[in-house]
Amino acid sequence: MRLKAILICVIFSLTVLPITPANAQVTPAVNLECESLDPSGAVEIEVYPGADLIGIAYCTVSNPNSYQEKIDIQVTADGLVTAHPGSITLGPNAEEEFTVTVKADERMTMSGRNLRVTATVTEVNGAPPPNIAESEVSMIVSILQFSGLQVEAVEASLTLESEFEQDVEFKVYNQGNWADQFSVGLTKDSLQELEYAGFSISIPLVKIEIESMAAPAKALIVLKTPKVSEDWPINSDGQHEKTFTLEFIATSEFSCRSEGYCNSETAYT
């Protein structure tokens, strides 16, 4: 009878021992997704003078486990300034959206930069995690090209004899943030006025490629003056003389192709 009692106690004590199922063990994990709303899929930043210089990545971090996690957020962007939350605490099976803001400098050279967002579990229910759990997303930050130009006449005015050929020189500056091609010539009104008066006009180069912020390129307008007309006014020396305005124009081809308008500048001689 005593032996039976001992056996019963042993069997009973075995049945009440706690058994921890394998799937209840604490194994931290984190999921991270990021995207850009820009059409290219990259985080695009406009850097033309007056732009806000900001690009944004939209991210979602989630805790796939049945316990609370504290998650640190780290961001690198190839030297660009970023703003983002330092850490996020998520309850069981919870998720949270956040933004990563990237700021560029005005007039920065067109380029692509690497953006890396990393989410790392640093606490599990208030305690250090037993393993390293992190999720990382890599994206591209695209510093967008913008157009800019300046033109100037080398000679503000010229006095020419009749039936004389003259090179009229202008300087074209590329003030955009990448190499650009510029079409050069005379405005339509100026060309019509000069041709109607009998000028012959030729342009050796109608397109010029210039590196960003490089030395100015030289553009030439070759004029051959007409014969003197008896209809022209007579000056103080008793000679027929008439003043014409030559209106030079340069246009960024990148702007016409990509910016929705043609960025042009004019200069006069």
Label the predicted regions.
Residues 1-25, 59, 170:
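Secretory targeting signatures
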Residues 22-269:
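Long beta-sheet-rich domains in secretory-pathway and surface-associated proteins
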